Swiss-Prot record:
It comes from the Eukaryota. It catalyses: Hydrolysis of (1->4)-beta-D-xylans, to remove successive D-xylose residues from the non-reducing termini. This is Exo-1,4-beta-xylosidase xlnD. The lineage of its organism: Eukaryota, Fungi, Dikarya, Ascomycota, Pezizomycotina. Optimum pH is 4.0. Stable in the wide pH range of 3.0 to 7.0. Disulfide bonds: none annotated. Glycans are attached at residues 23, 87, 142, 237, 326, 391, 404, 443, 480, 522, 618, 645, 658, 685, 707. GO terms for biological process: arabinan catabolic process; xylan catabolic process. Keywords: Carbohydrate metabolism, Glycoprotein, Glycosidase, Hydrolase, Polysaccharide degradation, Secreted, Signal, Xylan degradation. Residues 1-20 form the signal peptide. Pathway: Glycan degradation; xylan degradation.
Length: 798
């Protein structure tokens, strides 16, 4: 197979030193750094629909649209020779030309737009809409926005597939949690909260991509990744390929898997990706407890849903994990444990050998390939042109709504961290006529996209947006992300700044510091940038700082510097990011987003190892995430300012008929029509009247937190149970916000991983400031809402 020899040579060279070591750097062959190592897996395009009208398959059951998807898939797989079966166990499936089955590429990306597609050089199919990164989109606190973005991505993906340039499945969304701020891929996630944010994002994104809850036909097939406990790339040489994450049963149930439960049980995702890392000694892709007991038996994963390994993760079961004695056994262990498709070469390279050695059966292989094709059948792969999505074309990609939504998402996602009143800027009739735009993000284009992006239709940098405004703009870079371009760049920037009425410094971090396979070593502002910002502040001119990037940096020096008049977090705002930033600064739009991660002080990243997965405070670990952190953050999870003033008060309808006490047995005994489980029903509605008492129209966002001392210690500081966004609240007007507080959202996780509802006193509070507080009591005996299964491996390593 193309690329196989080179990957074997590289990985074999690592074998003597890599196996069994917990702190070792490995060649990382999953990303663009070494594309030649995985050339076959990286192939794009060339996908076509089977001919069910007159081709060899047309008279077989797989083309019978009246039959069940599983039966159709099983009939197809039964036609394959063993060699053909083996050749369809990897992400680059060869199909079976003998019977008219086309090749199929499983690896398609859609993190925040169509990517890893066969883009043309110009004209039709040369671009796709590039939305903000998920870390930014989630900050908007608008679940409808998430769904709309996913819906447009799926429409564009369908158009590319219909043109033979994409597939029917996508390796998205990434629903891991941004636990530690150094993680390079935190930008791909919805933030640090698992139960509310990551789970909500998973539900809205998956149902948007798939066309609804368990839609028939599926619009596209979403893949929930990376399952599970994956949130470190290469911190301190702890490679993601070989990390063995030590996670308590309590933390696994409470933090690292609830979003996968929602993805599987509620959103009905049809694919899940197992991750590179091991958890408690067992690699995820050979972990039958994860893939069978939890995912299928407990999380209610759809019957014919399939599991794909992350790219190369099956090989990693052997090297560097050393869980299997060789690559052939790693492949056998993984398929038997429940990894149906190998994004890699281990399955097709070794299943002939594994079959000969009786490590796998034909039935093992058929099970995995049948699951893949059953999902493709659900997506209309064998339905011919009668499938409702087959008429989507390039004209559907060229949609003004898509580009407008990309801008809207960017504008809604920008967080105002600090403002002494300088923002928004008034018109040029004021003293501000000339703006000096300085910094490594000032003329950002592809920087704004983060990672996993396709070519965008256009890129509006901050510089371009401001040049198109009413202000006179002078620009100089001043400094790059981590170094000065030359010895005079900072002095040139200072000269430029002195001649302007106002300074905007656009900096922060980008994919040179945080990305796949690369974590940060610290969470400080790059010293060269902080030095220049300090010098600019010393000029005494109005100064606005844009802090860009997915991960937070310690901005305490800027927060405390009175000469830094405003601080904005812009994340990775996508193709229209520059325009959105300019419009926020000039007051054409009003900020309303909130941080979905904690901004920690710099020493946080120095006092305990980033691979410590324990959330609760312990030893040098001061506690992780807003739920357990015992220190003082620079900016709290949920922080965000407005241009106007809002007052919030409890609505007369808040709660459930103003009850303040609920018996647990009575609550759980209620009929729950419209809900799968009684605990998914709201116990009460946290209803708040919000009035704009300022002079600017603005959206309003809010988070609802619960705190309690019910149940065993230690108790979390608080936890998020809901959020919402009100649009365009006019000055002097009021709107009502309703945040349902479900029974399940009040439960805690015990040491065995069970989700338990405890009797005691509870409070629901609005935002960090606790502007509105609703207190109530749960009475009676504690009740287990969700029973964590006993952990045992159904498949022993070979």
């Amino acid at each position: 197979m193309p690329g196989a020899a080179s990957i074997v040579a590289v990985l074999a060279a690592l074998l003597p030193t890599a196996l069994g070591q917990a702190n070792q750097s490995y060649v990382d062959y999953n990303i663009e750094a070494n594309p030649d190592l995985f050339s076959e897996c990286l192939e794009t395009g060339g996908t076509s629909f089977p001919d069910c009208e007159s081709g060899p398959l047309s008279k077989t059951l797989v083309c019978d649209t009246s039959a069940k998807p599983h039966d159709r898939a099983a009939a197809l797989v039964s036609l394959l020779t063993f060699e053909e079966l083996v050749n369809n166990t990897a992400n680059t499936g060869h199909g079976a030309p003998r019977i008219g089955l086309p090749a199929y590429q499983v690896w398609n990306e859609a993190l925040h737009g169509v990517a890893h597609a066969d883009f043309s050089d110009a004209g039709g199919f040369s671009w796709s809409t590039s939305f903000p990164q998920p870390i930014s989109t989630m900050a908007a606190l608008n679940r409808t926005l998430i769904h709309q973005i996913a819906t447009i991505i799926s429409t564009q993906g369908r158009a590319f597939m219909n043109a033979g340039r994409y597939g029917l499945d996508v390796y998205s969304p990434n629903i891991n949690t941004f636990r530690h701020p150094v993680w390079g891929r935190g930008q791909e996630t919805p933030g640090e909260d698992a139960y509310c944010l990551a789970s909500t994002y998973a539900y809205e994104y998956i149902t948007g991509i798939q066309g609804g809850v368990d839609a028939n036909p599926l619009k596209l097939i979403a893949t929930a990744k990376h399952y599970a406990g994956y949130d470190i790339e290469n911190w301190d040489n702890h490679s993601r390929l070989g990390n063995d994450m030590q996670i308590t049963q309590q933390d696994l149930a409470e933090y690292y898997t609830p979003q996968f439960l929602v993805a599987s049980r509620d959103a009905k995702v049809h694919s899940v990706m197992c991750s590179y890392n091991a958890v408690n000694g067992v690699p995820s892709c050979s972990n039958s407890f994860f893939l069978q007991t939890l995912l299928r038996d407990t999380f209610d994963f759809v019957e014919d849903g399939y599991v794909s390994g992350d790219c190369g993760a099956v090989y990693n079961v052997f090297n560097p994990h050393g869980y299997a004695t060789n690559e052939s056994s790693a492949a056998a262990d993984s398929i038997r444990a429940g990894t149906d498709i190998d994004c890699g070469v281990s399955y097709p390279r070794h299943f002939q050998e594994s079959f000969h050695d009786q490590e796998v059966s034909r039935q093992d292989l058929e099970r995995g390939v049948t699951r893949l094709y059953a999902s493709l059948i659900r997506a209309g792969y064998f339905d011919g042109k009668t499938s409702p999505y087959r008429n989507i074309t390039w004209s559907d990609v060229v949609s003004t709504n898509a580009q407008n939504l990309s801008y809207e998402a960017a504008a809604q996602s920008i967080v105002l961290l600090k403002n002494d009143g300088i923002l928004p800027l008034t018109s040029t009739s004021s003293s501000t006529k000339t703006i000096a735009l300085i910094g490594p993000w000032a003329n950002a284009t592809t920087q704004m996209l983060g990672n996993y992006y396709g070519p965008a239709p256009y890129l509006i940098s901050p510089l371009q947006a401001f040049q198109d405004s009413e202000y006179k703009i002078t620009y100089t870079i001043g400094t790059n992300t981590t170094t000065d371009p030359d010895s005079t760049s900072q002095s040139t920037a200072l000269t430029t700044a002195k001649e302007a009425d106002l300074i905007i410094f656009a900096g922060g971090i980008d994919n040179t510091l945080e990305t796949e396979a690369q974590d940060r070593s610290n969470i400080t502002w790059p010293s060269n940038q902080l030095s220049l910002i300090t010098k600019l502040a010393d000029l005494g001119k109005p100064l606005i700082v844009l802090q860009m990037g997915g991960g937070q940096v310690d901005s305490s020096a800027l927060k405390n510097n009175k000469n830094v008049n405003a601080l904005i977090w812009g994340g990775y705002p996508g193709q229209s990011g520059g325009q959105a930033l300019a419009d926020i600064i000039t007051g054409k739009r009003a900020p309303a987003a909130r941080l979905v991660t904690t901004q920690y002080p710099a020493e946080y990243a120095e006092v305990f190892p980033a691979i410590d997965m324990n959330l609760r405070p312990n030893g040098s670990n001061p506690g992780q995430t807003y739920m357990w952190y015992t220190g003082t953050p620079v900016y709290e999870f949920g922080h965000g300012l407005f241009y106007t003033n809002f007052t919030a008060s409890a609505s007369a309808s808040s709660g459930t008929k103003n009850r303040t006490s609920f018996n647990i047995d009575e609550v759980l005994g209620r009929p729950h029509l419209g809900y799968k489980l009684v605990e998914q029903m709201p116990l009460l509605n946290f209803t708040v009247d919000v009035k704009n008492t300022g002079d600017r129209v603005s959206d309003y966002t809010a988070m609802a937190f619960v705190n309690t001392t019910a149940g065993p210690a230690p108790h979390p500081n608080k936890w998020l149970v809901g959020f919402d966004r009100l649009s365009a609240v006019e000055p002097g007007s009021a709107k009502t916000m309703v945040i349902p507080v479900t029974v399940d959202s009040l439960a805690r996780t015990d040491e065995e991983g069970n989700r338990v509802l405890y009797p005691g006193r509870y409070e629901v509070a609005l935002n960090n400031e606790r502007e509105v507080v609703l207190g109530f009591t749960l009475t009676g005996e504690k009740a287990v809402l969700f029973k964590w299964p006993k952990e045992e491996q159904l498949i022993a390593p070979q």
